[in-house]
């Protein structure tokens, strides 16, 4: 019998996950189908009950449900608990277990696409939202030397550091302070939506003080190259867009569900084709 996998979010109509996962199932001869379900926040509890009732094998959880879903599960992986968000659910014989593949997916993409060793690197994270939390914890777990955070609301960045409780040295800066200190960092990461379609003229931070060969990474993938990344390229930065994080978080979820790691290059090709339309 064909297994069913799902995406729960609000909205989900724009998601590239179904096309990416269904191609992977087909490519690997796995009898399964992945479907996106629009789930309003007040119906999340019902949707999770539906996973149990219908025997849905696994679920991806996206905005705005990643934190709200946690108390509805039977078990939450320790890393996901530290991050404070779940994006992947595995239905193991009726027990629903929550994981977070966003942060680990980001780090895998960074290491494999840029061929960088995170250990001993000095990193600046822009933003302190859900995506920043996963990336912060995962980079700390990989042995980063310093992970500083700059955010419009400084108190939110401080809260992230306190709650994630990672064993790494971290300082919080305002955007202006961070811009002045850019030369101190090996890796700059934008975890905000600044510069995303349709506001493509915006940049999260000026790169005027960036040193050459800094890795500049943006988790946005629409557009494929944000204005910020274009600017970094002009300044001889090593750039990375958000396609890798999206693909690797999906690939790690796929592996949690099936025990098989999919062909990420094929996944990437499909996602880029869809984005180019």
From Swiss-Prot:
Record bears the keyword Ligase: no
Residues the record lists as binding shikimate: 15-17, 62, 87, 102, 221
Enzyme class name: oxidoreductase
Stretches that traverse the bilayer: none
Keyword annotations from UniProtKB, A to Z: Amino-acid biosynthesis, Aromatic amino acid biosynthesis, NADP, Oxidoreductase
Listed GO biological process terms: amino acid biosynthetic process; aromatic amino acid family biosynthetic process; chorismate biosynthetic process; shikimate metabolic process
Catalytic site: 66 (proton acceptor)
CDD domains: NAD_bind_Shikimate_DH
Assembly and interaction partners: Homodimer.
Cystine crosslinks: none
Name of the protein in question: Shikimate dehydrogenase (NADP(+))
One function term, GO molecular function aspect: NADP binding
InterPro entries, per database record: Aminoacid_DH-like_N_sf, NAD(P)-bd_dom_sf, SDH_C, Shikimate_DH, Shikimate_DH-bd_N, Shikimate_DH_fam, Shikm_DH/Glu-tRNA_Rdtase
Function: Involved in the biosynthesis of the chorismate, which leads to the biosynthesis of aromatic amino acids. Catalyzes the reversible NADPH linked reduction of 3-dehydroshikimate (DHSA) to yield shikimate (SA).
Enzyme Commission identifier(s): 1.1.1.25
NCBIfam families according to UniProt: aroE, PRK00258.3-3
GO CC field: cytosol
Catalytic activity: shikimate + NADP(+) = 3-dehydroshikimate + NADPH + H(+)
Family: Belongs to the shikimate dehydrogenase family.
PANTHER family membership: BIFUNCTIONAL 3-DEHYDROQUINATE DEHYDRATASE_SHIKIMATE DEHYDROGENASE, CHLOROPLASTIC, SHIKIMATE DEHYDROGENASE
Pathway(s) served: Metabolic intermediate biosynthesis; chorismate biosynthesis; chorismate from D-erythrose 4-phosphate and phosphoenolpyruvate: step 4/7
UniProt: NADP(+) binding residues: 127-131, 151-156, 219, 242
């Amino acid at each position: 019998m064909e297994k069913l996998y799902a995406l729960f979010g609000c909205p989900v109509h724009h998601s590239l996950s179904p096309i990416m996962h269904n191609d992977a199932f087909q490519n690997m001869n796995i009898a399964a189908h992945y479907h996106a379900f629009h789930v309003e926040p007040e119906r999340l509890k019902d949707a999770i009950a539906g996973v149990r009732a219908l025997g849905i094998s696994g679920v991806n959880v996206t905005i705005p449900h990643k934190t709200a879903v946690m108390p509805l599960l039977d078990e939450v992986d320790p890393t996901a608990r530290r991050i404070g968000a779940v994006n992947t659910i595995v239905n193991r014989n009726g027990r629903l277990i929550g994981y977070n593949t966003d942060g680990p997916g980001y780090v895998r993409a960074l290491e494999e696409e840029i061929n960088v060793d995170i250990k001993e690197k000095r990193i600046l994270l822009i933003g302190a939202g859900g995506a920043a939390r996963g990336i912060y914890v995962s980079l700390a777990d990989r042995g980063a030397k310093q992970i500083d955070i700059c955010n419009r609301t400084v108190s939110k960045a401080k809260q992230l550091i306190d709650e994630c409780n990672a064993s790494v040295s971290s300082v919080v800066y305002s955007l202006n302070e961070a811009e002045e200190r850019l030369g101190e960092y090996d890796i700059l990461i934008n975890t905000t939506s600044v510069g995303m379609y349709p506001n493509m003229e915006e940049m999260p931070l000026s790169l005027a003080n960036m040193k050459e060969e800094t890795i500049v990474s943006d988790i946005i993938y629409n557009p494929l190259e944000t204005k910020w990344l274009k600017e970094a390229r002009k300044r001889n930065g090593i750039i990375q867009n958000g396609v890798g994080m999206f693909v690797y978080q999906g690939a790690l979820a796929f592996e949690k569900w099936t025990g098989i790691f999919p062909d990420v290059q094929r996944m990437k090709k499909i996602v880029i084709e869809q984005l180019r339309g």
